[in-house]
């Protein structure tokens, strides 16, 4: 297939070659386990057996395409342990390993055996290829176009997984990342290689949304919080759709577009727009529903992905080229991409406002939408400004930084690492100055000269502050509850009683809203308008709005009182027949007469079960007027009267930013801190020990002894390493014995001593840096692991009846029933490390790996995760609850330290904690008591084990084996237990405390003695927390019971 040297088709050819340069079954081929297959493909011309298989797959799917530069992208994309291969075994087939293991890229001493589930002969490979062909050949062209590439990027590993094949390592000698992680990383690096070949620069570009937590917190209703989160995700998604269309999905490093719900949804919509066969669309929909949406087709019914999963930070790897027609030329200047990002961001917001205007105009018969339409017209100028700011930074790479003439420079393996750290540094500098979005509005002019439009009760002082954000002047001022309906009509806000009901349903009496907060409230009422951003440039605003108006679907978002009442709703559903006979309130048992969907999975599963889930608990059992009636009713039918409390859970991974820079802080959280890297030589002993263990364990087979020996020589400050020379010489001799004539000639030219010197230099460079040198493979592996972890997290939230407000990257904000929160924190923390009991969605988590069918992928076992849990009253102002949860987590995980076991002795550590709060009571539970958190498979059982203990104690209390007075009698024992330095005395006191409160003679409940000595210290923390672990365990249970009462 001939292509123009600068054409888009040639660029896509490069990327297809990158994705397919190694076959997914490479490990089996190079270890001679696919002998039948390679024999059957002997007519395919290639140097090596696995290249023969790869070439056959490429030819079958995309025709005869070729790219000589894939080797450079391959090398630059690889992880640091595979770079060792470029230095040690090169093209010599040295240190071959016929065993196939897959190791965790973050924790290389944890591994899985890889079995024999792969296409073993040509017929099975052809069957697999036909599955790809069936979906790829519907793009109405035989040539490779952007749609075909986007589709292949999506389905490549999904079809492999669906065929129930295993996932192999990219290299059997250093099996630390999967073949798919390697292939997708190579495709990403091809953006630089292609660009540099054309004498253009390559770029790393980052986008950071400023003040995400603050923006999300500015709301009075759950609907406001959820839509704020969705805006953060959707605006950035709109930005990156341009890059996906110009260059392909591989340019997005963070978040990965593999297993990504937004990307899967976008591509499905694009295929529909292209009028692809419905049968093919159904097959693709089945694949993504099964493996990307956890088997839930809510995204189809809602016509948007239900969860805001795009984080506030994006990283892209870009070629310095811009397309003109089907040809590429160099970007006009270095700021081109920065300007493009800002332009797209502002454009996305304005399109959204345009769509909201259009929709409200078409819905003016509804009182709320009529009000929205009026305000949008009056505040048109104000709404040209986005309510969020973004920072955009980039760094560039030139050809001479990577290449020396046409060959890779000897230090090219460090270039990506250098550029990424430069990008991080640029962001750190820019954070010194913060400009709020409000500062871009001309508020002084509006308020001073009475230009601010106001609808409703006019302010006597010129303006009133918005009650939702508390920052901007309000343009809607609702009358108070007294005579609300009458005043609404008199003030011209509503035309009749029907309008009043519509408005009151969305805006409460006494509420005041600024233009931005009204926009959020309106978008929360019709979230499908987010399609304007989600579809990028696929459809016009007018077409999207008309389609939405033509399909009238009501969308429910749960309130805090709904979350608090979930147990009561469930019990009412179980006893619906008897309770509906007794109920005076007919609407509670009304059957749904209209289509309704919710972002809350619990609602959708129970909508048609006989109890009206759309009723507002605040107007029924939480109402002062009806509370006594419902208390009596529920008691008669043995239904739990609901507690007015719910749990707000916030979670954030520890040191993820450091991990992406290759720093070792996640491995020794608190023992090594981020600030230590200003002078990391002071932590040389800990750092070198970790790095050496990682580098040794990253190998598999004969290479391990060689690496050990080289590191021993470095440790001994030896310039020469005779033992390593001997090992290397013996390996050369052994390979030469079985080598063909061509390989033997290469081996005869090897200067063994020089090769060993290169190895010494390589390892010294890494040890001097005191961190892992990051590569695209490192980033792609972590980014895709975060996506898989996110899918598990969403499944857990739904399992525990919660509602997701935000779930971008490693962050989570969710509401759960109080009685589910301990189980959720335990399971979530373990799942993040890669361990679970039972299946979660389509995944099983097994000792640091996620298994999807038979394919294993790495989880993030060495990364800690911290949680804040606020037990809040449904009527508490959400703004304060959200901010409290943020401050509690951000400050607590930095300031609270506790003792952990490291290398046989106790050290002070921090992070990886769960902080609980209810009213004035706060407790802290460490989620791990050693560093690294995981160092062997047995360590997985210890993660969140203290939460297990708390749950077991709660179970004994709930079952009546132990009295709840145990938690309050503790105060009599507390000072003795805390003051005791002798374990036997502490154990005696604890046993006596439990025995005194046991309701049965023999209650077997013990606390591991290692917990007695755990102490917490708090640095500059304004909140009082007990210093001993036993007190924190007791206080945590008090907090939970306080929320359940």
Swiss-Prot record:
GO biological process: defense response to virus
Keywords, ordered alphabetically: Antiviral defense, Cytoplasm, Metal-binding, Nucleotide-binding, Zinc
Binding positions for a divalent metal cation 1 per the UniProt entry: 652, 811
Subcellular location: Cytoplasm
Binding site for ADP: 229, 233, 811
InterPro entries the UniProt entry points to: Cas10-Cmr2_palm2, Cmr2_N, CRISPR-assoc_Cmr2_N, CRISPR-assoc_prot_Cmr2, Rev_trsase/Diguanyl_cyclase
Annotated positions binding a divalent metal cation 2: 810
Stated role: CRISPR (clustered regularly interspaced short palindromic repeat) is an adaptive immune system that provides protection against mobile genetic elements (viruses, transposable elements and conjugative plasmids). CRISPR clusters contain spacers, sequences complementary to antecedent mobile elements, and target invading nucleic acids. CRISPR clusters are transcribed and processed into CRISPR RNA (crRNA). The CMR complex degrades RNA complementary to the crRNA (target RNA) within UA dinucleotides, generating 3'-OH and 5'-phosphate ends.
Subunit composition and interactions: Part of the CMR ribonucleoprotein complex, consisting of crRNA plus Cmr1/Cmr2/Cmr3/Cmr4/Cmr5/Cmr6 at 1:1 and possibly 3 Cmr7 dimers. A Cmr2/Cmr3/Cmr7 subcomplex without crRNA can also be isolated. It does not cleave target RNA.
The name this protein goes by in its record: CRISPR system CMR subunit Cmr2
Organism: Saccharolobus solfataricus (strain ATCC 35092 / DSM 1617 / JCM 11322 / P2)
Lineage, uppermost ranks: Archaea, Thermoproteota, Thermoprotei, Sulfolobales, Sulfolobaceae
Gene: cmr2
């Amino acid at each position: 297939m001939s292509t123009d040297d600068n054409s888009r088709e040639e660029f896509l050819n490069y990327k297809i070659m990158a994705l397919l340069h190694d076959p997914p079954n490479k490990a089996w081929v190079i270890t001679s386990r696919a002998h039948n297959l390679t024999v059957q493909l002997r007519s395919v011309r290639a140097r090596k057996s696995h290249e023969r298989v790869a070439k056959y797959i490429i030819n079958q799917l995309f025709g005869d395409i070729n790219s000589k530069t894939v080797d450079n992208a391959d090398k630059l994309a690889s992880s640091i342990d595979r770079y060792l291969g470029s230095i040690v075994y090169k093209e010599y087939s040295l240190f071959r390993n016929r065993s196939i293991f897959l190791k965790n890229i973050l924790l290389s001493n944890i591994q899985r055996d890889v079995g024999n589930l792969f296409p073993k002969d040509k017929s099975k490979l052809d069957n697999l290829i036909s599955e790809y062909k069936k979906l790829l050949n519907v793009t109405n062209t035989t040539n490779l176009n952007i749609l075909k590439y986007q589709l292949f990027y999506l389905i490549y590993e999904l079809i492999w997984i669906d065929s129930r094949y295993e996932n192999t390592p990219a290299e059997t000698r250093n099996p630390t990342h999967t073949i798919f992680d390697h292939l997708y990383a190579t495709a990403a690096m091809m953006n630089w290689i292609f660009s540099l070949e054309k004498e253009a620069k390559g770029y790393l570009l980052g986008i950071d949304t400023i003040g995400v937590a603050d923006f999300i917190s500015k709301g009075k209703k759950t609907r406001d919080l959820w839509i704020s989160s969705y805006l953060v995700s959707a605006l950035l998604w709109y930005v990156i759709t341009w890059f996906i269309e110009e260059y392909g999905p591989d340019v997005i490093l963070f978040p990965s577009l593999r297993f990504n719900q937004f990307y899967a949804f976008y591509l499905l919509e694009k295929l529909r727009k292209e009028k692809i066969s419905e049968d093919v669309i159904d097959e693709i929909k089945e694949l993504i529903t099964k493996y990307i949406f956890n088997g839930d087709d809510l995204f189809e019914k809602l016509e948007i992905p239900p969860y805001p999963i795009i984080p506030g930070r994006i990283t892209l790897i870009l070629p310095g080229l811009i397309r003109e027609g089907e040809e590429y030329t160099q970007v006009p200047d270095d700021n081109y991409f920065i300007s493009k990002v800002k332009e797209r961001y502002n454009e996305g917001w304005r399109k959204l406002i345009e769509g909201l205007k259009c929709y409200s105009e078409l819905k003016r018969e509804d009182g709320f939408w009529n009000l929205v339409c009026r305000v949008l017209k009056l505040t048109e100028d104000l709404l040209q400004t986005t309510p969020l700011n973004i920072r955009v930074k980039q760094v560039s790479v030139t050809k001479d930084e990577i290449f020396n003439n046409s060959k890779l420079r000897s230090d090219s393996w460090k270039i990506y690492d250098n550029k990424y750290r430069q990008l991080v540094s640029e962001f750190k500098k820019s954070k010194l100055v913060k400009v709020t979005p409000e500062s871009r509005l001309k508020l002084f002019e509006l308020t001073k000269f009475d230009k601010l439009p106001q609808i409703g009760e006019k302010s006597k002082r010129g303006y009133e502050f918005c009650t939702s954000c508390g920052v901007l002047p309000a343009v809607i001022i609702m009358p108070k509850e007294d005579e609300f309906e009458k005043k609404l009509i008199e003030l011209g806000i509503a035309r009749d009683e029907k309008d009043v009901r519509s408005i009151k349903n969305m805006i409460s009496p006494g509420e005041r809203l600024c233009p931005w907060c009204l926009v959020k409230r309106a978008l929360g009422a019709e979230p499908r308008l987010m399609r304007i951003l989600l579809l990028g440039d696929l459809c016009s605003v007018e077409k999207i709005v008309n389609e939405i108006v033509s399909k009238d679907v009501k969308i429910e978002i749960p309130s805090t009182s709904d979350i608090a009442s979930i147990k009561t709703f469930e019990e009412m559903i179980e006893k619906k027949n008897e309770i509906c006979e007794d109920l005076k309130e007919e609407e509670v048992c009304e059957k749904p007469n209209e289509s309704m969907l919710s972002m809350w999975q619990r609602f959708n599963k129970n909508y048609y079960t006989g109890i009206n889930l759309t009723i507002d608990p605040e107007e029924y059992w939480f109402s002062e007027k009806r509370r006594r009636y419902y208390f009596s009713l529920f008691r008669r039918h043995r239904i739990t009267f609901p507690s007015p409390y719910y749990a707000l859970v916030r979670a954030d991974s520890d040191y993820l930013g450091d991990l992406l820079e290759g720093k070792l802080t996640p491995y020794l959280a608190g023992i090594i801190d981020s600030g230590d890297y200003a002078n990391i030589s002071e932590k040389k002993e800990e750092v070198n020990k970790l790095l050496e263990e990682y580098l040794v364990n990253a190998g598999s087979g004969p290479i391990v002894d060689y690496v050990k020996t080289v590191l021993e020589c470095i440790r001994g400050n030896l310039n020469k390493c005779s033992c390593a020379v001997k090992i290397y010489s013996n390996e050369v001799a052994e390979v030469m014995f079985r080598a063909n004539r061509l390989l033997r000639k290469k081996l005869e030219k090897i200067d063994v001593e020089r090769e060993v010197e290169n190895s010494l230099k390589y390892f010294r460079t890494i040890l001097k840096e005191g961190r892992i040198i990051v590569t695209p493979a490192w980033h792609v592996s972590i980014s895709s692991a975060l996506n898989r972890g996110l899918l598990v997290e969403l499944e857990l939230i739904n399992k525990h009846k919660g509602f997701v407000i935000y779930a971008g990257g490693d962050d989570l904000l969710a509401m759960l029933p109080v009685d589910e929160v301990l189980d959720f924190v335990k399971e979530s923390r373990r799942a993040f490390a890669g361990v679970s009991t039972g299946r979660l969605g389509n995944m099983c988590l097994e000792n640091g790996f996620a298994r999807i069918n038979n394919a294993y992928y790495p989880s993030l076992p060495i990364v800690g995760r911290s949680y804040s849990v606020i037990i809040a009253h449904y009527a508490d102002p959400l703004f304060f609850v959200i901010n409290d949860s943020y401050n509690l987590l951000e400050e607590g995980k930095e300031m609270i330290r506790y003792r952990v076991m490291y290398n046989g002795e106790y050290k002070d550590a921090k992070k990886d904690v769960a902080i609980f709060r209810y009213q004035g009571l706060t407790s802290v539970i460490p989620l791990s008591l050693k560093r690294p958190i995981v160092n062997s498979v047995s360590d997985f059982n210890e993660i969140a084990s203290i939460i297990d203990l708390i749950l077991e104690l709660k179970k004994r209390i709930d079952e009546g084996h132990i009295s709840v007075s145990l938690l309050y009698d503790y105060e009599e024992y507390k000072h003795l237990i805390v003051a005791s330095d002798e374990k036997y005395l502490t154990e005696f006191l604890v046993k006596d405390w439990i025995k005194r409160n046991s309701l049965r003679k023999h209650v077997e409940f013990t606390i591991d003695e290692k917990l007695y000595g755990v102490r917490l210290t708090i640095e500059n923390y304004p909140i009082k927390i007990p210093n001993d672990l036993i007190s924190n365990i007791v206080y945590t249970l008090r907090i939970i019971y306080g929320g359940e009462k």
